[in-house]
Amino acid sequence: VSPEPVRIRALEPGDLPAVTELVLGVLAEFGFTAKVGGVERDLREMLERYAGASAGFWVAEKGGAIVGTVGVRAKEGRTCELKRLYLRSTERGTGLGQRLYEHAEAFARSAGYERLWLESSRRFARAHRLYQRNGFVLLESLDNDWEDDLYEKVLSPVTGPQ
């Protein structure tokens, strides 16, 4: 029996409850329960926050269920931020995280961004390995509630003074 195919597609309004459930479920799995106010707000305002030509949000759908997410939105200038790369536990290690990341990076390049930035908790060690494999460089390790690491990847050669 061949495994069920996974389709990556743009977020639709009807996806919001399933996306919220997936993201908050992954956060709870990694021990983040109380401090998710900003995440909940981002999820509630997702259709607005990821709208327009400079942003996007995608879901991975398998058998009618949402099993992964990823987003990109403007940060400043030609830098965008990779957001909400989350996978259901059953999909980790299948290559789906890489597929979602590649989808997001392709969008960032086509939208004219030169740098991709992200902030991710050190609890997500497996995801950090994916970022490093894909050319992200650690900028800073924060001593905040989320134990965040900040990463950046240069997408295209930047000419002239920095």
Regions flagged by a language model, labelled:
Residues 6, 10-83, 88-90, 101-103, ...:
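Acetyl-CoA-dependent GNAT
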Residues 64, 95-97, 112:
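Conserved G/P- and acidic residue-centered "switch" motifs that form tight phosphate/ATP-binding loops
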Residues 89-92, 117-127, 144-148:
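Conserved beta-strand-loop-alpha-helix junction that forms the acyl-donor binding cleft
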Residues 108-120:
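Conserved GNAT acetyl-CoA-binding A-motif
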Residues 131, 136:
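Conserved active-site tyrosine of GNAT-family acetyltransferases
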